[in-house]
């Protein structure tokens, strides 16, 4: 892959739809109608490490919890069948600007987590979307049992992307329950 490209995931191609070159895509973003807002994207095959292919979105719509995406470069099912399990990516700088105190998952994953008392808890290794609020999985070492921290204003006091740190004020008993 071109080292100068800093690409982020927006979708995964999981199959074809119809015979006119449309593809079924699982959206990897929670931005509604994301593919309608995009023009140029990069198709990436991470298994075979091909260079990204630039493609242009002609149209997209939602069907049975899938995005159906049509690229202007291809008009036939035979031309797109090989894209199964490829990813759709865009340059990081083309992501929409978020509101204050909103972050992309890749900005949170990897942050060091410390308490307001300056105790190091570990690193954010995963984020779970539970419906009511996200939950951050924090691990010190690979084999340690992770701590699950609710992504609530009462708990997460500060996120500093420049310093790569999250400061939390854990509810009483949370660490005791996790151990």
Curated annotation (Swiss-Prot):
Keywords: Chaperone, Cytoplasm, Ribosome biogenesis, rRNA processing. The keyword rRNA processing applies. One of its GO terms (biological process) is rRNA processing. SUPFAM superfamilies: PRC-barrel domain, Translation proteins. The keyword Chaperone applies. GO terms for molecular function: ribosome binding. Pfam families: PRC_RimM, RimM. One of its GO terms (cellular component) is cytoplasm. Residues 99-174 form the PRC barrel domain. It is found in: Cytoplasm. InterPro entries: PRC_barrel-like_sf, PRC_RimM, RimM, RimM_N, RimM_N_sf, Transl_B-barrel_sf. Belongs to the RimM family. The PRC barrel domain binds ribosomal protein uS19. An accessory protein needed during the final step in the assembly of 30S ribosomal subunit, possibly for assembly of the head region. Essential for efficient processing of 16S rRNA. May be needed both before and after RbfA during the maturation of 16S rRNA. It has affinity for free ribosomal 30S subunits but not for 70S ribosomes. Binds ribosomal protein uS19. This is Ribosome maturation factor RimM. It comes from Natranaerobius thermophilus (strain ATCC BAA-1301 / DSM 18059 / JW/NM-WN-LF).
């Amino acid at each position: 892959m071109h080292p100068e490209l800093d690409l982020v995931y927006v979708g995964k191609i999981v199959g074809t739809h119809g015979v006119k070159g449309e593809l079924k895509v699982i959206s990897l973003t929670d931005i509604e109608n994301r593919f309608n807002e995009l023009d140029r994207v990069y198709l990436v095959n991470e298994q075979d490490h091909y260079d990204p292919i630039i493609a242009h979105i002609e149209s997209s719509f939602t069907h049975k919890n899938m995005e159906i995406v049509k690229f202007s470069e291809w008009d036939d099912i035979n031309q797109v069948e090989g894209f199964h399990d490829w990813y759709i990516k865009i340059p990081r700088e083309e992501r929409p600007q978020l509101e204050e105190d909103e972050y992309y998952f890749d900005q949170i994953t990897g942050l060091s987590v410390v308490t307001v008392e300056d105790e190091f808890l570990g690193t954010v290794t995963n984020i779970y979307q539970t419906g009511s609020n996200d939950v951050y999985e924090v691990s010190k070492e690979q084999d340690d049992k992770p701590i699950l921290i609710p992504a609530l204003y009462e708990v997460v006091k500060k996120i500093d992307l420049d310093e790569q740190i999250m400061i939390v004020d854990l509810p009483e008993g949370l660490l005791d329950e996790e151990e």
